[in-house]
Swiss-Prot record:
Modified residues (Methionine sulfoxide): M110, M136
Main location: secreted
Highest taxon of source: Eukaryota
The entry's keywords: Cholesterol metabolism, Glycoprotein, HDL, Lipid metabolism, Lipid transport, Lipoprotein, Oxidation, Palmitate, Repeat, Secreted, Signal, Steroid metabolism, Sterol metabolism, Transport
Ranges: Sequence repeats: 68-89, 90-111, 112-122, 123-144, 145-166, 167-188, 189-210, 211-232, 233-243, 244-267
GO biological process, one term: positive regulation of Rho protein signal transduction
Entries under PANTHER family matching the protein: APOLIPOPROTEIN, APOLIPOPROTEIN A-I
Tissue distribution: Major protein of plasma HDL, also found in chylomicrons.
Protein name stated in the entry: Apolipoprotein A-I
Biological source species: Pongo abelii (Sumatran orangutan)
Gene: APOA1
Complexes and interactors: Homodimer. Interacts with APOA1BP and CLU. Component of a sperm activating protein complex (SPAP), consisting of APOA1, an immunoglobulin heavy chain, an immunoglobulin light chain and albumin. Interacts with NDRG1. Interacts with SCGB3A2. Interacts with NAXE and YJEFN3.
């Protein structure tokens, strides 16, 4: 179990290099930057959509009758959560920095393996790209006369044009499939090599580095404990910030319920 957790952590901390394996080099982005970006997008979308729903409810007949002032409470809650996110930012950043530092050696070894395999398969990728561009240019040359013919003709030629294009499309599909199959065949040994290298790294870590693995686990647990302790004040601030909001909602709801009950009794 420890090995599995460590594997996931290391793969994540390598900068998701496997995801970019077939891509060109991109500007480096730290794991914390990726997590922060995803969390920010998710929270912003949730906040905006939630506020829209609250606004729609308050604008309805029932919302106006209850007069719960949900929109004011929603703004207060989102402000409180934004404050919490700002307070936890440095603490979480410190956690990721410590974890990256502890796994630096292992990440460098795995990055080296990825780069070596990438260098071996790059000629096949370049050749595939070149052939694909050639096929697209050949297809364009074959289709161009038909396009000109369509412009000169009328609608009655559409069916005839479709019959002429169908074989070309099938030919293009078959040729593309052949190139993809050839690329897959060329890359298969290197994919297996990369898989075997990764398995060997993890096996060596498990067999010969038991103490090292235990050390990783102990340090990760220590960092998590530190993160938990440092987050307590911010979470307490969140609780204190939400209490007035919840109390205000409770008072507004009970007041609206009492008023509604009185109206029912007078009818």
């Amino acid at each position: 179990m420890k090995a599995a957790v460590l594997t996931l952590a290391v793969l994540f901390l390598t900068g998701s290099q496997a995801r970019h394996f077939w891509q060109q080099d991109e500007p480096p982005q730290t794991p914390w930057d990726r997590v922060k970006d995803l969390a920010t997008v998710y929270v912003d979308v949730l906040k905006d959509s939630g506020r829209d729903y609250v606004s729609q409810f308050e604008g309805s007949a029932l919302g106006k009758q209850l007069n719960l002032k949900l929109l004011d409470n929603w703004d207060s809650m989102t402000s409180t959560f934004s404050k919490l996110r700002e307070q936890l930012g440095p603490v979480t950043q410190e956690f990721w920095d410590n974890l990256e530092k502890e796994t630096e050696g292992l990440r460098q070894e795995m990055s080296k393996d990825l780069e070596e395999v990438k260098a071996k398969v790059q000629p096949y990728l370049d050749d595939f790209q070149k052939k694909w561009q050639e096929e697209m240019e050949l297809y364009r040359q074959k289709v161009e006369p038909l396009r000109a013919e369509l412009q000169e003709g009328a609608r009655q030629k559409l069916h005839e044009l479709h019959e002429k294009l169908s074989p070309l499309g099938e030919e293009m599909r078959d040729r593309a499939r052949a190139h993809v199959d050839a690329l897959r065949t060329h890359l298969a040994p290197y994919t297996d090599e990369l898989r075997q290298r990764l398995a060997a790294r993890l096996e060596a870590l498990k067999e010969n580095g038991g103490a090292r693995l235990a050390e990783y686990h102990a340090k990760a647990s220590e960092h998590l404990s530190t993160l938990s302790e440092k987050a307590k004040p911010a979470l307490e601030d969140l609780r204190q910030g939400l209490l007035p909001v919840l109390e205000s909602f409770k008072v507004s709801f009970l007041s609206a319920l009492e008023e509604y009950t009185k109206k029912l009794n007078t009818q």
